[in-house]
Curated annotation (Swiss-Prot):
Alphabetical UniProt keywords: Hydrolase, Metal-binding, Nickel
Any one GO BP annotation for this protein: urea catabolic process
NCBIfam families according to UniProt: PRK13192.1, PRK13203.1, PRK13207.1, urease_alph, urease_beta, urease_gam
Pathway(s) served: Nitrogen metabolism; urea degradation; CO(2) and NH(3) from urea (urease route): step 1/1
Swiss-Prot/TrEMBL catalytic activity: urea + 2 H2O + H(+) = hydrogencarbonate + 2 NH4(+)
Top-level lineage group: Eukaryota
UniProt cofactor(s): Ni(2+)
Sites where the protein binds Ni(2+) 2: 488, 517, 543
Name of the protein this chain belongs to: Urease
GO molecular function: nickel cation binding; urease activity
The keyword Ligase belongs to this UniProt entry's keyword annotation: no
Organism: Oryza sativa subsp. indica
Length: 843
């Protein structure tokens, strides 16, 4: 066959398209992925038929599917389909704009060549009305650009025989010589139009434009070099001599009107909707997260309206305009993420994010301090000739997720994790050994060396836990000094009070965390005996509800104990119609149980209780459970930590309404910001605090590693757009690598340069104990990753958990499993549907 890579990838696209055709033929309405696959694959088949042009296929692509053949969210998700195919005259790009543009598609064309039966249109339900993913609800009111700047009007005539277009931030005095206007008045001025837009002068055009003064230090650079330097009226005669000498069109304009922006005469005003279409939503606007019912309201925008950093042809970030000139690399950002809506436990705001040396060095307003107001541009956020740009207008940025309950059963889980937005993994294991399939323990020093070395080039921060199940300290110091950043107590190794006490004593000496999976059997004692064994020492309880393991039926009581830092694993997140039914077989496989042994079956069944799973939902919403993690391949799904967190938040909003604001318990905000901040803390800052590395990762804050996830709002929580790891793009949605542009199908999450060679090591951290770092494991193991010690975990309490520090008194009825918190019964119904599911995923 001699297939090249692009052909192999198009085969995968064809398979997805044919799968979509089979689903369509049996009357199913297609989701986003299916619709894209069908349209792109069919376009390629019509290209192969050879009797249609690019223009023909651009039109035909809009005829295949209608609104009744796709799920209600799809027309809002699907704006364009692009694909490249081989015509008789070579490879060409076909772009289908607004591919879902009628109520019904032409199903004969949609199924052409498949030999599948064409279903009757009657099989498809009515279009219906649905809230669309990523919806923005705009604040009322208007935005005045370039407020308080000096302004004037000028008449401009194009004497050229070609059109001339001038961008918003181009120094107007430097404009094309064929434009005739009063250049003396234009000194130190630019167009008063939205940043990144332009005014076009056709040949012979005469227009009156409004100019505003440049901001900042008022230094002109670039253009034609006429007025290079600081704006100084005493040098104006010299500047005008250059204008005349170089033949630049100039004509006095005595009718110019002058004023100040804000007085109404010269103002350029935009409404929030128009503003958002260019730069993304701003203060007061609300964004729907994916297809959930959660709305994030932007609390603050660091932008200076009219001076936004926009990259592209004729845009702002050009030499002498938004990009500064004359600044060395040491004074400028390596990378700037522009106009991002940041969702973090610290708040929901809009800003530029500055990255240097793999770290977040500043958050606020980036740009050129020579032309942008100094109260706006942060001195740490200068954009220069050495700066790369990641345009995040209309996008959401979050901190990279942390999964702190990982069974390292296979290396491929790292690919799934980072593609979902997880950038830090904590857990244990050695591969698909039976011990690892059940417990998160990397037991021996040789295993620890293996795991640190084998994951060294992966673009993910790593931390491994040793086995803590022993009643004597012997052996524990060795694994800690070998690199363990924590210890794990697991019932499959015997989580007895004696082992708990010994493990915690060793952890206290080494300042590391202890994670525990308690005794489901109640063999050595019940939950109160295990709590007593903690002796008020800090401990992190895994899957604190109990379906993942722990004292039956009341391990959930630990969520009300001050020295316990509780977490959940994601198969029970949230409580749905099928949650209970899937768990028995999951548990039997994970813990190496035999369904022919009655006691094994009884053990498994004792862990699965609808009542406590339902209570777990509510405890999360109350902030009484602080973390959500995966339990990867051992009763957990590593690629769904983020998705299931937001599914839980959405279910709770639907069933419990808006959360009261913590500072005003009798009031609720007209948004979901408090709930959103509470839930994002569960997979970012709180696991970082619990594991002792919150100085390095866990939030979008200055000084931390630039581990960032960029999302389209319509895909938030389901599929990221880009994952930045230590300042480098490690993973991103990318189309056909042979294509003329990055967007033709098949678009998929692919590893980027930040994931290859030594880059994965350079942009990531291996977390170890202080003892291991001091012992020099980085050199001993020849690690490329930066090695950092965890710490400050002993003495943590629930009160250290951000936005998740509730301490209710929890009781469980041992017969009915009814859960109460401070005397209130915690009960909710399983949901039959969740967002972030059927609209987005092929299987």
């Amino acid at each position: 066959m001699k297939l090249v890579q692009r052909e192999a990838e198009k085969l995968a696209l064809h398979n997805a398209g044919f799968l979509a055709q089979k689903r369509l033929a049996r009357g199913l309405r297609l989701n986003y992925t299916e619709a894209v696959a069908l349209i792109a694959a069919q376009i390629l088949e019509f290209v192969r038929d050879g009797d249609r042009t690019v223009t023909d296929l651009m039109d035909l692509g809009k005829q295949l599917l209608g609104r009744r053949q796709v799920l209600p969210a799809v027309p809002h998700l699907l704006e364009t389909v692009q694909v490249e195919g081989t015509f008789m005259d070579g490879t060409k790009l076909i772009t289908v704009h607004d591919p879902i543009s009628s109520d019904d598609g032409n199903l004969e064309l949609a199924l052409h060549g498949s030999f599948l039966p064409v279903p009757s249109l009657e099989k498809f339900s009515s279009v219906g009305v649905d809230d669309f993913p990523g919806e923005v609800r705009f604040c009322s009111g208007h935005i005045v650009l370039n407020l308080h700047r000096r302004a004037l009007t000028l008449k401009v005539v194009n004497k050229a025989d070609r059109p001339i277009q001038i961008g918003s931030h181009y120094h107007f005095i430097e404009a094309n010589p064929y434009l005739v206007f009063d250049r003396q008045r234009a000194y130190g001025m630019r167009l008063n139009i939205p940043a990144g837009t332009a005014v076009r002068f056709e040949p012979g055009d005469a227009k009156t434009v409004t100019l505003v003064s440049i901001g900042g230090r008022k230094v002109i650079r670039g253009g034609n070099g006429i007025a290079d330097g600081a704006v100084n009226r005493s040098q104006l005669n010299e500047v005008m001599e250059k204008v005349i000498a170089k033949g630049f069109g100039h004509e006095d304009y005595p009718d110019s009107s002058e004023g100040i922006i804000g007085d109404g005469t010269h103002d350029y005003i935009v409404d929030h909707e128009k503003y958002a279409s260019m730069y993304g939503p701003t203060t007061g606007d609300k964004i729907r997260l994916g297809d959930t019912d959660l709305f994030a309201e932007i609390e603050k925008d660091y932008a200076i309206y009219g001076d936004e950093c926009i990259f592209g042809g004729g845009k702002v970030l050009r030499d002498g305009m938004g990009q500064s000139a004359g600044y060395p690399a040491s004074d400028c950002l390596d990378t700037v993420v522009t106009n991002a809506v940041v969702i973090d436990y610290t708040g929901i705001y809009k800003a530029d994010i500055g990255i240097n040396g793999g770290l977040i060095v500043a958050i606020g307003k980036a740009g050129n301090p020579d032309v942008m107001d100094m109260d706006g541009v942060n001195e740490e956020m200068i954009v220069g000739v050495n700066t790369e740009v990641i345009a995040a207008e209309g996008m959401i940025v979050t901190a990279g997720g942390i999964d702190c309950h990982v069974h390292f059963i296979c290396p491929q889980l790292a690919e799934e994790a980072i593609a979902s937005g997880i950038t830090t993994l904590v857990g244990g294991g050695t591969g698909p050994a039976h011990g690892t399939c059940a417990t998160t323990c990397t037991p021996s020093p040789s295993h620890m060396k293996l795991m640190l070395q084998s994951t060294d080039e992966l673009p993910i921060n790593m931390g491994f836990t040793g086995k803590g199940n022993t009643t004597k300290p012997d052996g524990l110091a060795e694994i800690i000094k070998a690199g363990a950043m924590g210890l794990k107590l697991h019932e499959d190794w015997g989580s007895t009070p004696a082992a708990i006490d010994n493990c915690l004593s060793v952890a206290e000496a080494f300042d590391i965390q202890v994670n525990i999976h308690t005794d489901t059997l109640n063999e050595s004692g019940c939950v109160e005996h295990t709590i007593a064994a903690f002796k008020d020492r800090t401990i992190h309880t895994y899957h604190s509800e109990g379906a993942g393991g722990g004292h039956a039926p009341d391990i959930i009581k630990v969520c009300g104990v001050k020295n316990v830092l509780p977490s959940s694993t994601n198969p029970t997140r949230p409580f749905t119609l099928n949650t209970v039914d899937e768990h028995l077989d999951m548990l039997m496989v994970c813990h190496h149980l035999d369904r022919n042994i009655p006691e094994d079956v009884a053990f498994a069944e004792s862990r699965i209780r609808a009542e406590t799973i339902a209570a777990e939902d509510i405890l999360h919403d109350m902030g009484a459970i602080s973390i959500i993690s995966s339990d990867s391949q051992a009763m957990g799904r590593i690629g769904e930590v983020i998705t299931r967190t937001w599914q839980t938040a959405n279910k709770m909003k639907r069933q419990r309404g808006r959360l009261p604001i913590s500072s005003s318990p009798d009031a609720a905000e007209d948004n979901d910001n408090f709930r959103i901040r509470r839930y994002i803390a569960k997979y970012t800052i709180n696991p970082a605090i619990v594991n002792g590395f919150s100085d390095f990762v866990g939030s979008v804050e200055v000084g931390k590693l630039a581990d960032l996830v960029i999302w389209k709002p319509s895909f938030f929580g389901a599929k990221p757009e880009m994952v930045i790891k230590g300042g480098a793009i490690a993973c991103a949605n990318m189309g056909d690598p042979n294509a003329s542009i990055p967007t033709p199908e098949p678009v998929m999450m692919r590893p980027m340069f930040g994931a290859f060679g030594g880059a994965g090591s350079a942009n990531s951290i291996a977390f170890v104990s202080k003892a291991a770092k001091e012992a020099g494991v980085a050199v001993q193991y020849k690690l490329g990753k930066r090695v950092e010690a965890v710490g400050r975990v002993r003495g943590l309490t629930k009160l250290n958990m951000k936005l998740n520090d509730a301490l209710p008194k929890i009781d469980v009825d041992p017969e009915t499993y009814t859960v109460t918190a401070d005397g209130e019964v915690l009960r909710c119904q399983p949901t039959p549907t969740v967002p972030l599911s059927r609209n987005y995923f092929l299987f």
